[in-house]
Amino acid sequence: MTTPTTVAGVDLPDLQPARELPARPEPLRMKPGETALVVVDMQNAYASLGGYLDLAGFDVSSTGPVIANINKACAAARAAGIPVIFFQNGWDPAYVEAGGPGSPNWHKSNALKTMRKRPELEGQLLAKGGWDYQLVDELTPQPGDIVVPKIRYSGFFNSSFDSVLRSRGIRNLVFTGIATNVCVESTLRDGFHLEYFGVVLADATHQAGPEFAQQAALFNIETFFGWVSSVDDFCTTFSPVGQPS
């Protein structure tokens, strides 16, 4: 998967030199034109009090700094001409897309389990069109940003994501969002198997569960599937030449 060098037989100049992003376990060379910033599931469900994760018993009290860091990364990406892609996770209001008892998703989704335990929440959690499904107010997509709906943990499953990337010559995916140990890691892993280079900006992600879940996910990514960097390093690397981030 490479960026097109010709269109209708006409050579296209490569105007964007590769940048070296500081990362673990080693720096990674990336071209802005082959890179996308991916914002995973920054919805009220995952980042707001009263959202699904909060109602299911997960701590979302420290998501504020993550939202601020994602905003910073988005601004840097847009300034560098890097596309920003938002995922929204959820299902139709009747939950047909969630699957029934024959689907493992029906048994493992904490949103579905919470609604079965608390019938008064039926139809509220992760239902398209509802408050829970909406992106948080602080992370409103801007003109030119892309929003991709998804119905499972991995953003590659039954979505337009891979097509969106391939049609733009994207091969580097820089991940932010919630939850590091669930949808972020699932999508990055699937990208690895599809030959995408995946990087997580650790301080722009948040786990579902205790802190060790965050550290375990970052360990898995750094050791087996990709790279780990930071928002400041991303912003500095892709700042306009000659300008500070």
From Swiss-Prot:
Keywords from the named record: Hydrolase
- EC id: 3.5.1.110
Q: Where is the active site?
A: 41, 150, 183
GO MF term set: hydrolase activity, acting on carbon-nitrogen (but not peptide) bonds, in linear amides
**What positions belong to coiled-coil segments?**
none
Biological-process GO terms, alphabetical: nitrogen utilization; uracil catabolic process
Catalysed transformations (reactions) = (Z)-3-ureidoacrylate + H2O + H(+) = (Z)-3-aminoacrylate + NH4(+) + CO2; (Z)-3-ureidoacrylate + H2O = (Z)-3-aminoacrylate + carbamate + H(+); (Z)-2-methylureidoacrylate + H2O + H(+) = (Z)-2-methylaminoacrylate + NH4(+) + CO2
Instruction: Return the broad EC class.
Output: hydrolase
Pfam families assigned = Isochorismatase
Which domain of life, per UniProt? Bacteria
**What this chain does, per the record?**
Hydrolyzes ureidoacrylate to form aminoacrylate and carbamate. The carbamate hydrolyzes spontaneously, thereby releasing one of the nitrogen atoms of the pyrimidine ring as ammonia and one of its carbon atoms as CO2.
Q: Which HAMAP family match?
A: RutB
Give the UniProt family note: Belongs to the isochorismatase family. RutB subfamily.
Quote the protein name from its UniProt record: Ureidoacrylate amidohydrolase RutB
What is the organism of origin for this protein? Pseudomonas syringae pv. syringae (strain B728a)
High-level lineage = Bacteria, Pseudomonadati, Pseudomonadota, Gammaproteobacteria, Pseudomonadales
The encoding gene: rutB
